[in-house]
Amino acid sequence: MSIVVKNNIHWVGQRDWEVRDFHGTEYKTLRGSSYNSYLIREEKNVLIDTVDHKFSREFVQNLRNEIDLADIDYIVINHAEEDHAGALTELMAQIPDTPIYCTANAIDSINGHHHHPEWNFNVVKTGDTLDIGNGKQLIFVETPMLHWPDSMMTYLTGDAVLFSNDAFGQHYCDEHLFNDEVDQTELFEQCQRYYANILTPFSRLVTPKITEILGFNLPVDMIATSHGVVWRDNPTQIVELYLKWAADYQEDRITIFYDTMSNNTRMMADAIAQGIAETDPRVAVKIFNVARSDKNEILTNVFRSKGVLVGTSTMNNVMMPKIAGLVEEMTGLRFRNKRASAFGSHGWSGGAVDRLSTRLQDAGFEMSLSLKAKWRPDQDALELCREHGREIARQWALAPLPQSTVNTVVKEETSATTKSDLGPRMQCSVCQWIYDPAKGEPMQDVAPGTPWSEVPDNFLCPECSLGKDVFDELASEAK
């Protein structure tokens, strides 16, 4: 099935509702994706890109229903990755002499995937044009490392459509093709997720390349991406967002993520978050357990944040494997203008937190002091964690803190959360995890200061996932 994009331009791509992993398992496509291919019918017929290789036969069959394959005059490959040019082998088997227009680097990539050096390659550079009749031309713009060396964009004069390749796209599948037809909140989230996880390493290239394209002084009525929606309603809105995101982007937000073996590091994370919120209630704080969270959501939140706190238990004197892997990914993403602090618990011997601090510094973060706890933190240790959070809030504040929070918030919370007001702490009889009403359970939206009697019935123990019925009053507090 084809969709009219504009005039003689048709979408002939493929929706992929089921895909959940991209780039191996490095990117979770929780809302599917699409592989956008475009057929332009003027005096010359042009195909821009193909689809993912797993849809090769289906793509060629559908394309046959649109046009006699022998009538395709030119093929333009903006990017040689398999989700763009994957169907080339199947297509070229039918029309082996059709000229392929691409960058010089793309020839190496295409041959590396398809192994057909005999194909009719035509190298294009920035500013080169191709006349397709009816007074229209294709103008080519090289965009190396956005996000492969072979990448380029193609602009169609007359219709003023920019075929933008991966830039301005998103892994987002919907029966509707255009940006004004889909849920705007979902669309924004997927655009930001895509930029944060794929294009962040190349942010330094984004602004000059966009400036170069704008320097052509060409009107842009539509931006036709390689994945997700076609931007037809105010298409330059996504360009403005890219310029914003490329400028060492940060919000007044702190992300905390951790891994834990015995819940000790998790207790530290909660206490640190409480300290931050006490001192700077303006800052948004998000906590993630890496073992139970979507990795790409964590990285998107790091991208949005002014700083990140990373926690790990110590195992064999080093950090937990999932933390090590995620820090390695952050190193590759090359975040800028962000601060970091490491924390974690250990038993008879430490090592993980120091190692983690070094890795975060190597990843380009401006480091603050780290925090360690031995074994399960007691109330004194948790107060140190809260104080660490308060100090982080002060150090990382983007504006002067409200004086009331600096002077009185700790005293006010102490008086408001006495045991007589909130009732006893409760202990899970299975795993021994303790619910403290003064701290609540932020991961399940149970606010600090919530007595056990007011905790929702669907509450689950964060450690063993059993319900409220397995909890007993803590023995030391039972009367």
UniProtKB/Swiss-Prot annotation:
Binding site for Fe cation 2: D83, D166, H227
CDD domains: flavodiiron_proteins_MBL-fold (cd07709), rubredoxin (cd00730)
Binding site for Fe cation 1: H79, E81, H147, D166
Major localization listed first in the record, in broad terms: cytoplasm
Pfam family, one: Rubredoxin
Localisation: Cytoplasm
Binding site for FMN: 260-264, 342-369
Cellular component aspect of the GO annotation: cytoplasm
InterPro entries, per the entry: Anaer_NO_rdtase_flvorubredoxin, Flavodoxin/NO_synth, Flavoprotein-like_sf, Metallo-B-lactamas, ODP_dom, RibonucZ/Hydroxyglut_hydro, Rubredoxin-like_dom, Rubredoxin-O_OxRdtase
UniProt-annotated binding residues for Fe cation 3: C428, C431, C461, C464
Start and end residues of each Rubredoxin-like domain: 423-474
Pathway(s) this gene product operates in, as recorded in its UniProt entry: Nitrogen metabolism; nitric oxide reduction
Residues covered by the Flavodoxin-like domain: 254-393
Family annotation (HAMAP family): NorV
Role description: Anaerobic nitric oxide reductase; uses NADH to detoxify nitric oxide (NO), protecting several 4Fe-4S NO-sensitive enzymes. Has at least 2 reductase partners, only one of which (NorW, flavorubredoxin reductase) has been identified. NO probably binds to the di-iron center; electrons enter from the NorW at rubredoxin and are transferred sequentially to the FMN center and the di-iron center. Also able to function as an aerobic oxygen reductase.
Stated name of the protein: Anaerobic nitric oxide reductase flavorubredoxin
Species, as recorded: Shigella sonnei (strain Ss046)
Primary gene name: norV
